[in-house]
Amino acid sequence: MSEAGVLKFAENGLLADISSMYGEGDAKPLDCLTFRYDGTPVAYSAANEVLNLWYNNDLLKEVCEKQGIDPSEVTPPADAEDAWDWDTFVQTAQKLTLDINGKNALDPDFDPDNVDIYGCTINTLPWQLEVWAKSNGSGYYSEDGSECTIDSPETIEALQKIADLSDVYHCAPPVTSAANALESSLGSKKVVMATDGAWNVGTFLGPSADFDYGVGVLPYMKEKVTICTGGPNVVFSTTEHPEEAMEWLKWYYQEENSWSLIEAGTWMPILDSWYTDPEKTDKWISNPNYPDKDMYKSAVVDYAMNNAQSTSWYYVNGTEEFNATLDSVFSSVWAGEETMEEAINENLEELQDIFAENNG
């Protein structure tokens, strides 16, 4: 089942309460991977995915060599303790942005109309953009999902900062939906850093990327946070055998049953023991499909365990329609026609209606 559809099924009474699936002493799914309706667990994700900052290490070194910069000064940190604040991230991205004359975006003679290499790009899918609103102390919704906060000053400020990367600081390319995939951003060899999900290790970076790549934690505005997601399996309330269904799902959720996807890097484990037991973690990340083991352990495994919050579809209904509307709302901002505040306020009634209709 799609993530965004879970709570609609639960609202219609179609999903069973699965709170008894795991008992005392069991390895359990990470709490952020639990779909809840009115506080009741109704599904767990079958895999975990978190957002990170990925980078083309070959291109980073090339840009540094052209400018006489020490690569270690501009390499994304892999530890949340060392995460860049937003201003540091922007300045670093500007240093890594070069025009056709070799001048970076901090140089007063930089030519923003003729950029050769961009320092960064941010994935602008609406569900991914919420991480920045959360990092700035808000979100699209309140923490308990009872209120739509898309127009909060913190959310608007965070989203405007994403637009400013292109429009003000010239360190990110103009926003297009095609550029969201790492194949298009890092794969172009014209972008040094890009945000996207951990699944890219298995779908692109591991098997297909013809460059050395690395992974870091996301920069932060106020709070060091990433968001997680993963498609769920469910137990229908109409089943005559709920205990057996939960027992089967509990077996299915064991990492051994999806090992090929985990080993490839497409999926991450859901059970907490794979994040806390060194032997299990080592089995998971000690393979050639992954980047440097210590880097991945810190930037992805520990980050997912300690800094991940649930994407809003785990606790809010109607996110598919809400995000589709946001995609349209944001388009005028990416085009430079409106500020984020103008675009959101012009469409606020429609957004609030979508929320209210699905979360009455």
Question: What does each model-found stretch correspond to?
Answer:
Residues 90-95, 131-133, 143-176, 205, ...:
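Glycine-centered hinge/linker elements that transmit conformational signals in sensory
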Residues 36-47, 51-53, 81-148:
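Extracytoplasmic/periplasmic solute-binding protein
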Residues 3-4, 81-88, 173-187:
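Short helix-initiation/N-cap motifs at beta->coil->alpha
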Residues 1-54, 61, 87, 108-114, ...:
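Hinge/lid segment of periplasmic solute-binding proteins
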Residues 12, 60, 88-96, 179-194, ...:
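Short helices/loops that flank or line small-molecule/ion binding pockets
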Residues 39, 206-273, 328:
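Extracytoplasmic/periplasmic substrate-recognition and gating elements
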Residues 209, 216, 263-328, 332, ...:
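Long, aromatic- and glycine/proline-rich binding clefts that accommodate carbohydrate-like moieties
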Residues 16-28, 71-81, 110-119, 138-157, ...:
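Short, solvent-exposed loop/beta-turn-alpha elements that line the ligand-binding surface or hinge
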